[in-house]
Amino acid sequence: MRSPKVKFLTIFTLSILITKMSFASSACFNEAGTMFRIEPNLIKAIALVESNLKKDSIGKNRDKKNNIKSFDYGLMQINQMHIPMLKKRGIIKDERDLLDNPCLNIKIGTEILYKHFSRCGMTWQCLGTYNAGFAMDNQKKRLQYAKKIYIVYTRLNELDNRKALAK
């Protein structure tokens, strides 16, 4: 169990990160949640873990030899494998759209998560596929990722409850 001081610092740090979100981006999480029937705080937790809420974040995925194998873009760290289909559907022109339009990035990431939940059920193990994919040998990575999301998600809900009680 964490000490009260560590718990306070973690919650304090989370509250600072959440303050960084503009009203518009909070509205985007809510809108994406409504569109895909996924709780907005779960989406926010993913964005916090994936990019620390940095809309222009570009992640590099590396293989065991440290070679770059793919890139992830924006708040929700949309993997480049999705770009051809997003272009084909007319949703983006190129990966720059994933960096320049945080609301669009949130909605695309939420749609990807929705498709994963549709495939393997609304479970923490399935949520882990958002980051670690569906490969059988990635089960441990999926659970580790899901645990990170769960911790942040729980803290976001605690903050919301504190705000509600303070009113």
UniProtKB/Swiss-Prot annotation:
- Pfam families hit by this protein: SLT (PF01464)
| Segment forming the signal sequence | 1-24
Q: Does the keyword Signal apply?
A: yes
The compartments listed are: Periplasm
Entry keyword Secreted: no
Membrane-spanning parts: none
Q: Which UniProt keywords apply?
A: Periplasm, Signal
Report the sequence similarity comment from the record. Belongs to the IagB/IpgF/P19 family.
The protein in question is named Peptidoglycan-binding-like protein
